[in-house]
Amino acid sequence: MSEHVKTELVDGVLVLTLQRPDKKNALTGAMYDALSDGLERAEADGTIKVVLFQGDGDSFTAGNDLADFAAQAKSNSDKESPAFRFIQNLGKATKPLIAAVQGNAVGVGTTMLLHCDLVFLAETARLMTPFVNLALVPEAASSWLLPARIGHVRAYQMFALGEPIDATTALASGLANAVVPATELRQKAMAAAVTLTKRPAGALSATKKLMRDFERIAARIVDESELFKERLRTPEAREAFAAFAERRQPDFTKPSS
């Protein structure tokens, strides 16, 4: 388990808390593995009825820790990445997933919400999917799930322009159940989670199975992953990551490949 992910079982709710607030809860490979361990534990343990994701500090998560991500991409090019393992576990989760989101939810911090059955946002929440900014493509089946949820043009705006949307807009777009004051966020999410623990677990899983096309989600996750890995090897991606490391704006004016 990662020191930056706290795992706690409370009244049938497995609470997974991101605890790297000094880095805006940016996700490392170890953190992804810890989250996957939690999801796999939930699937195998009948006493766990619901999984709740939350983050310490003023951000839910800044997405990938890019330095860690780049290092892993070089060293594990032929292996299943921790991020991919987590995304696969999200896609096949049969138990209710709930998210409590405050501040920034960047990249996977937003796409993972598409796999959550209930999403509660603090008034400070901002959702952002800046994959194209890094010369990459969407992941977590979001290239299918997001347009299906909010429509093509709004999804394309989020992907291609990479601009954040605020909590009110996210709620109106169907990406969340409620917007609440930050001080009430965790209480609201936990109350919903506890309510679900009292519902018949079999009926909840059967309902989720009817609502989600698990096979299509799994296939899209693989398709995105293959294209994602291809994009990582392009000059555009190398320029994007170099610009990030050098704290400058990337220059994509050269011919791409």
Regions found by a protein language model. Give the residues of each.
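C-terminal long alpha-helix characteristic of the crotonase
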Residues: 21, 120-125, 176-223, 229, ...
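CoA-thioester-processing core
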Residues: 86-93, 100, 106-160, 173, ...
